[in-house]
Design a protein with these regions (language model features):
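Loop-to-helix "switch" segment enriched in basic
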Residues: 38-42
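Structured non-transmembrane domains adjacent to transmembrane bundles in polytopic membrane proteins
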Residues: 46-67, 74-167, 396-591, 600, ...
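Short beta-strand segments
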Residues: 71-72, 255
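Membrane-embedded transmembrane helical bundles of large multi-pass transporters/channels
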Residues: 1-37, 115, 133-399, 514-517, ...
Length: 746
């Protein structure tokens, strides 16, 4: 198949490149508006208890769970004439909007409500509303209201917060972060590619394919928005993934093409040979990454599902562009792929000699790997112990869903959230629970009384009255019951994501209700989300392990190497998760990164990072094993040959894998500049994983383990050997001559 693709691509190179240019232009135009069509939610499933309760509240009880807050502050106090005028005006205007219901404010609410809408310092009053239309419409409405009323005038400051405003700020920030990340990554990538290849022309090719992948990623995301909800967080992640993989894959193919030219092949034959060999590696790598991302579709959350759909499509686009477009460009360029040597001027400036080619057996990588294999057992023990130690903080991981603290301290929604936590202890801003008794019109006095006696509950608001510690303290707030049923609000200062918060939720559930009760609120959302993720996680892990094992078995014909790869990847990712807990949950380096440690991680992020990092780690595993296997098949297949072929394989791939890892780290690392905290975690975690995987894992641990296992590396039971002979992926031609290495380069 690869041979036919390469032959077709090199037979009609101009037509293919013109078609690619037209496709890139279409993708760019079609995907330009994608950010405005993406959603900020997707952290809970539609059939979860909290989701069903939220729908009933939205449909039957206007404003029961406000998703929008305006904070009106005056140094002269919330009761000053200026604050009252602004607060009343804002509440009235929002109340006239068709997409706003349940509007209430400190200045217009009755006494039972009014007291809790004023800050403890007396300077701030609140305007609450529920913005309808779903997450997308609500966040757009929040942005419009914030633009109209936000700011400071006549000594009164108005700021927007609440879930809808948070979503709007996140959408806006992520779009800005994407522009910044690409602005940082692309120039740095161009510089590193030029250093790696020397030739400006050769360096431009992976970058061009990467830009094509970005355009394709935007168009793919936009296309999926026509049929399903797609998370806004997929914007940065899939474009970064597309750029990183496209550059990675192109680097392998361009390097192999230049090698084949040095070996004496003609332009077209060299391009075809590059696709047959490096293209085969690219195909397996893309298949592994795509399968790992596809596993995300088993989770019933569109936050993860959108990564499955868009991620697989972007991986396919990056691989296809590398396998189809690059050969066309390479055959047209021919020897000019080595033109414009940017390093020549630097060598003349510093009086350095021209590089000479060194056989792999004389390279630094070859010597290093042989030393590692001579000390295989201690090297293995030290690295495994270090990875386990780094991963140990993951044993104390805690999970919770994102709130305004994912945003930087300077954002309006973050400022409002901080004010609510500090100055409005009685406001139910998600910390408590809202309980829906759908279709029930009976008395709830006993139920409200019992709920108010639960530890940590500060008050219970119900149609029977306001209850504190078992006693009725005030008349019932209006609107808590109607023909559809009724709801109760449980106010608490307990962190919903803490152990105490989950314990309190269980105690509230245990209180006998007069009718079937549905719980809403952050504690219930957290419990529902963790249950949903936990129920599907074993299946996801099993599918990733199985798919990786099958692909690597078809690639190598061994059952030992796939098992080793799965175990090593799991160990490597455990270390990465330990570092993320240490930094983002426990707060180490938080000042350096500018993030707020909340004491927990967003539970969907480790799953997303596990699937993606697992697939990406296999990228270098496949590339390394492909070269080791080529040498192994050409050998006598003895124990000594095992040692020699491992050293040869690492020597062949060490420099190019290091360069590929550095390039991928630049693209992913640019996301650390993001202002949304768990996007920073995503970028930093994957960057560290890629760098560690390409150096410590592939350069040290894998050779050490392959030395310890000897010829057993290539073992498979008889039936599986025959299965591989029939269905496995085999070399299409003889193994190529060794890839020389530039002297003096790592």
């Amino acid at each position: 198949m690869l041979t036919r693709i390469a032959q077709f691509s090199t037979r009609f190179p101009r037509a293919i490149l013109l078609a690619a240019l037209a496709a890139a232009a279409f993708c760019g135009l079609f995907g330009a508006s994608v950010a405005s069509h993406l959603q900020s939610g997707g952290f809970t499933s539609d059939d979860a208890e909290s989701s069903r309760a939220a729908r009933l509240l939205a449909e039957n009880f206007d404003g029961a769970q406000p998703n929008f807050v305006l904070l009106v502050r005056s140094d002269k106090g919330a009761d000053s004439a200026a604050a009252r005028q602004v607060g009343t005006k804002v509440a009235t205007k929002i109340g006239h909007r068709a997409d706003a219901v349940g509007v209430r404010s400190y200045w217009t609410s009755p006494a039972p409500i009014q007291s809790v809408l004023r800050s403890t310092d007396g300077h701030t009053g609140l305007v609450l509303a529920y913005l309808t239309g779903g997450d997308d419409a609500a966040q757009k409405a929040a942005g419009a209201i914030a633009s109209e009323f936000g700011g400071t005038a006549s000594g009164v400051t108005v700021q927007a917060g609440g879930l809808a405003a948070i979503y709007h700020d996140v959408n806006s920030q992520i779009t800005k972060d994407l522009t910044l990340a690409e602005g940082v990554a692309i120039p740095l990538t161009a510089i590193v590619l030029t250093v790696v290849f020397g030739s400006v022309i050769a360096a431009a090719l992976p970058l061009a394919v990467g830009l094509f992948a970005i355009a394709a990623a935007l168009a793919i995301l936009r296309g999926f928005t026509l049929f399903t909800d797609v998370s806004i967080y997929a914007l940065n992640m899939t474009t970064a993934l597309g750029l990183a993989l496209a550059i990675d894959y192109s680097l392998f193919i361009v390097s192999r093409f230049r090698e084949e030219l040095r070996n004496g092949l003609g332009h077209r034959d060299a391009a075809i040979r590059a696709v047959q060999t490096a293209g085969r590696t690219v195909l397996f790598s893309a298949l592994t990454v795509a399968l790992a991302l596809a596993v995300l579709s088993v989770f019933n959350l569109y936050f993860l599902k959108s990564f499955a759909y868009a991620g697989v499509a972007v991986v396919v686009a990056a691989a296809a562009a590398s396998i189809v477009l690059l050969p066309a460009a390479l055959v047209l360029l021919g020897d000019r792929v080595n033109a414009l040597d940017a390093r020549a001027g630097l060598r003349r400036l510093f009086g350095r000699p021209a590089p000479v080619f060194v056989a792999p057996e004389q390279s630094r990588w070859y010597r290093t790997v042989n030393w590692v294999m001579r000390h295989a057992l201690p090297v293995t023990l030290v690295i495994v112990a270090a990875l386990l130690a780094i991963g140990s903080p993951f044993l104390g991981v805690k999970f919770g869903y994102p709130d305004d603290r994912v945003m930087p301290a300077g954002s309006a929604s973050r400022a409002v959230g901080d004010e609510l936590r500090g100055q409005f202890p009685a406001v139910n801003a998600g910390n408590g629970a809202t309980i829906v008794l759908n279709g029930y019109s009976g008395d709830v006095t006993g139920y409200a009384t019992a709920l108010s006696k639960v530890d940590g509950v500060s008050a219970v608001l119900s149609d029977a009255g306001v209850y504190v510690s078992g006693g009725r303290m005030a008349s019932p707030p209006p609107g808590m019951a109607n023909a559809s049923g009724q709801y109760l609000t449980v106010a608490t200062s307990v962190d919903p994501y803490s152990t105490a918060g989950q314990r309190q939720l269980r105690q509230l559930h245990a209180v006998p209700a007069p009718a079937p009760a549905l719980f809403a609120g952050n504690a219930e959302i957290d419990a529902d989300g963790l249950h949903s993720l936990g129920a599907r996680l074993p299946l996801a892990v099993a599918l990733i392990a199985l798919s990786t094992f099958v692909v690597l078995f078809l690639f190598t014909g061994s059952v030992v190497l796939p098992l080793k790869a799965v175990l090593i990847n799991t160990l490597s990712l455990t270390a990465m998760f330990g570092m993320m807990v240490w930094i983002f949950q426990d707060g180490h380096l938080s000042n350096l990164l500018g993030v707020t440690a909340t004491g927990y991680l967003v539970p969907t992020m480790p799953i997303l990072m596990f699937c993606l990092a697992f697939g990406m780690s296999m990228d270098y595993e496949v590339f390394l094993l492909s070269r080791i296997r080529e040498a192994w098949l050409a050998s006598e297949r003895t124990a000594a040959d095992n040692v020699r072929t491992v050293a040869i394989g690492v020597a062949h791939t060490g420099r190019i894998v290091t360069a590929a890892a550095l390039l991928m780290a630049i693209v992913l690392g640019a996301m650390v500049s993001a202002k949304v905290s768990f996007m920073q975690m995503f970028g930093l975690g994957l960057t560290l994983t890629v760098l560690a995987d390409a150096t410590v894992i592939r350069g040290l641990l894998v050779p050490a383990l392959m030395r310890l296992m000897g010829t057993a590396n290539w073992w498979a039971p008889g039936p599986l050997r025959r299965l591989h002979e029939r269905f496995g992926f085999h070399e299409q031609s003889a193994a190529p001559t060794p890839e020389p290495e530039l002297a003096g380069l790592p």
